[in-house]
Amino acid sequence: MQKVRLLVSGRVQGVGFRYSTYALALDIGDIYGRVWNNDDGTVEILAQSDNPAKLAKFIQEVRKGPSKWSKVTYVDVTMAN
């Protein structure tokens, strides 16, 4: 099981980003985790999958901004334990 932590910056709160991230994970499939807003305006995502290709696709799509109203400026990706 591969696990990652994504810290997403930009216009990512109040624009449906968390819901769109959830929908993206369902659409790709085999992605599990959670997503929440931080007090500093960022969104944090913990995601895991047994399929590295699907996890890579998820990260790629988060970088694009899963919500049409969001504007992602930076995504910090780290391996999680």
Set out the residue ranges of the language-model regions.
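Intrinsically disordered, low-complexity, mixed-charge
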Residues: 1-81
